[in-house]
């Protein structure tokens, strides 16, 4: 009996360890000024609690944004965001990584506003070598205007994982053997912004921004950056292969994470470029390998 209980305990510990091992490290929340600087329209950024929380304001004159001080090759980046409440049609709240040249790499979270009572749409995209057109859109399973939620990117040599409250919503694998470009040698800064995009953001541009509701306000906190900092000209990370996100358990999702991703895919996906045969009669190679992600 004792030996059976011991075996059961060992199995449970093993299962718990395997379920936890692939979860990104817990983000470290820091004040805005630790990692970030304003990018434009400085007077449209409001600071609270010693810079631990900020607001971005959008009016008919301008939006605003901020970026990291450094550029990074691989890492874990997250932001706690509370979206613009009420009638947010035409607005875009963005959290993304991007390099700085014509053939740039980019990893995007874009939150598309909507009319009061209609759900936000989260659009993700990946650019490699200046080419994007890899849009996926989902509804969120909560109201992102009521409370802060954490949006994260885990980026290593093997995959890019988009996470919402630590739940994977998308994976972009390194499939260089198929000729698919992958972001691996262009340092990227992290950018956050609130701006008007009523020419496309809501119902393809049919719903315009109602400026009588301005200013539109998005709230940010957390400001977590755990990446390998590189100069803009550097094409490699000095500690490549040695950071926690490079280890074996982060080269793929574990079984629990795959189930959560499948749940998002089945319940909340409203557009996936991999299933758009009108747009892509010949599926992109990454879609032929991984149509479910």
Swiss-Prot record:
The active site is at 106 (nucleophile), 110 (proton donor). Its main location: secreted. Keywords: Apoplast, Cell wall, Cell wall biogenesis/degradation, Disulfide bond, Glycoprotein, Glycosidase, Hydrolase, Secreted, Signal, Transferase. PROSITE patterns: GH16_1 (PS01034), GH16_2 (PS51762). It catalyses: breaks a beta-(1->4) bond in the backbone of a xyloglucan and transfers the xyloglucanyl segment on to O-4 of the non-reducing terminal glucose residue of an acceptor, which can be a xyloglucan or an oligosaccharide of xyloglucan. Contains at least one intrachain disulfide bond essential for its enzymatic activity. Catalyzes xyloglucan endohydrolysis (XEH) and/or endotransglycosylation (XET). Cleaves and religates xyloglucan polymers, an essential constituent of the primary cell wall, and thereby participates in cell wall construction of growing tissues. Belongs to the glycosyl hydrolase 16 family. XTH group 1 subfamily. This is Probable xyloglucan endotransglucosylase/hydrolase protein B. The gene is XTHB.
């Amino acid at each position: 009996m004792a030996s059976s209980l011991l075996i059961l305990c060992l199995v449970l510990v093993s299962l718990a360890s395997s379920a936890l091992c692939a979860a990104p490290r817990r983000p470290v929340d820091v004040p805005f000024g630790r990692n970030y600087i304003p990018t434009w329209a400085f007077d449209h950024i409001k600071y609270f609690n010693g810079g631990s929380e900020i607001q971005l304001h959008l009016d008919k004159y301008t939006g605003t944004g901020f970026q990291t001080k450094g550029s990074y090759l691989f890492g874990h980046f997250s932001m706690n965001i509370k979206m613009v409440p009420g009638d947010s049609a035409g607005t875009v709240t963005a959290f993304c990584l991007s390099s700085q040249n014509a053939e740039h790499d980019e990893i995007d979270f874009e939150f598309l506003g909507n009319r009061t009572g209609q759900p936000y749409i989260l659009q993700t995209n990946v650019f490699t070598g200046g080419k994007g057109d890899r849009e996926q859109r989902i509804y969120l399973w909560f109201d992102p205007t009521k409370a802060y939620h954490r949006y994260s990117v885990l980026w290593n040599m093997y995959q890019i994982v988009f996470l919402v409250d630590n739940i994977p919503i998308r994976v972009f694998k390194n499939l260089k053997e198929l000729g698919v470009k992958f972001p691996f040698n262009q340092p990227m800064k992290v950018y956050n912004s609130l701006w008007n995009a009523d020419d496309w953001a809501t119902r393809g541009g049919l719903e315009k921004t109602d400026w009588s509701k301005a200013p539109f306000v998005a709230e940010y906190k957390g400001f977590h950056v755990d990446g390998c900092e590189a100069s803009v000209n550097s094409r490699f990370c000095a500690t490549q292969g040695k950071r926690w996100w490079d280890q074996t358990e982060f080269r793929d999702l574990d079984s629990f994470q795959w189930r959560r991703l499948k749940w998002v895919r089945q319940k909340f996906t409203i557009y996936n470029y991999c299933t758009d045969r009108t747009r892509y009669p010949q599926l992109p190679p990454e879609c032929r390998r991984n149509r479910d992600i």
